[in-house]
Amino acid sequence: MNELELKYGCNPNQKPARIFMRDGSDLPLTVLNGKPGYINFLDALNAWQLVRELKEATGLPAAASFKHVSPAGAAVGNPLRDVERQMYFVEEGADLSPIACAYIRARGADRLCSYGDWAALSDVCDAATARYLKYEVSDGIIAPGYTDEALEILKTKKKGNYNVVQIDPDYVPAPQEYKDAFGVTFQQGRNNFEINEALLTNLVTENKDLPEAAKRDMIVALITLKYTQSNSVCYVKDGQAIGVGAGQQSRIHCTRLAGTKADTWWLRHHPKVLGLQFVENIRRPDRDNAIDVYLSDEYEDVLAEGIWQKTFAVRPDPLTAEEKKTWITALTGVTCGSDAFFPFGDNVERARKSGVQYIVEPGGSIRDDHVIETCLLYTSPSPR
């Protein structure tokens, strides 16, 4: 099959719509269930490239959670700690494979933004991954294959309409790509730039100690950013993107946005959050929304009398500003990556507030010296 008709394009008024191969060859993908749309396929194909490259670069199973053509999260398949199982609503005693851990961690970076996501897996989707996805609100999944059991589980989602796409893992796209804007065709070579440890040798700070875990996290950050709408900044810890600031017109706004998301991710570890007692049969999205509001300055929106009873079995005490500040200061070992240079040292200052100890960015600003001087104040390595 060399083309696939779509219901509509980016918007419902944009018809007709289709995906096809310019050279007339067969599409490198097969729809196993559902009827994916235009944005679904954009998410799927971008997410697949991300997880494929992440697997190649780290040697670990990788997963991504995509929304609106940018990753809400990405991660490699490190085992989940007990606190993470609790945070991410993993069923007690669930036996998790590495690829299941990768997706749970990818989705767990920003569960609010991952609502209705497109999942991408570097490896065959197994039953453990499918069982976790079964209870999450998701639009679809792309993977190089599915076990029979996993496919049957996924086909039960969305009343049988869950989108399941299988990609040919051996497919190599043409070296040139095209895009039309206002009737004008743009042509460019594909972004085949390889991200690996060889890029991490130019340490501009006095501290030259770059642990292997930090190198891995830098690679996770850079590959995640490669498939994020620019401008973008990504915070990573333990092989997991914990905050992605995508598509902002100011670099510092990217850094702040990603930092705020990283802070929220870390605050979800707080005993008060882990101890929240929800009403029976509450849906996962409602829990996620309640936690997000509980952690915000508008916490009274879920704690006010007559309101909290809809969500909580017991009214929780607020997490005070001082408690949040104290908890966030305990976050360490975070890596911050940027898809372009930091123009000012304020990005470094903001990143430090969210536990960043390692920064990776390409450099090239006329104020590089100022950015490096700011890094030197904190002595952590900063490769370029």
Q: Model regions: which residues?
A:
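Conserved small/polar residues in nucleotide/adenosyl-binding loops
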Residues: 378-384
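Active-site-proximal loop/turn and secondary-structure-junction residues that shape catalytic pockets
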Residues: 70, 125, 237-240, 342
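Substrate-contacting helices/loops that form the catalytic groove of nucleic-acid
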Residues: 175-210, 268-284
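Flexible, glycine/charged-enriched surface loops at secondary-structure junctions
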Residues: 57-65, 164-167, 230-237, 267-278, ...
